[in-house]
């Protein structure tokens, strides 16, 4: 399973689990995990290969991060 720019419903659009960036991200990358209108976790990593764990019922948002693939 993989995800790129957009908002993904965990358990519907993508599987729950740990996702990692396929390529090193730039300082324009932003990711966010939310439930409804509440942000659970977010980051602007600024580089490297960020890794994010998402659970069923959450939303996973990616902006300018390339593709994340389930590990």
Model regions and ranges:
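Primarily secretory-pathway and cell-envelope proteins
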Residues: 1-2, 25-71
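A glycine-anchored, Pro-Gly-centered beta-turn/N-cap motif
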Residues: 4-6, 10, 15-18
């Amino acid at each position: 399973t993989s995800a790129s720019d957009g908002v993904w419903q965990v358990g519907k659009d993508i599987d729950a689990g740990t996702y990692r960036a396929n390529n090193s991200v730039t300082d324009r990358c932003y990711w966010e995990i939310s439930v409804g209108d509440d942000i659970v976790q977010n980051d602007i990593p600024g580089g490297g290969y960020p890794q994010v764990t998402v659970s069923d019922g959450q939303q996973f948002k990616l902006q300018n991060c390339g593709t994340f693939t389930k590990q």
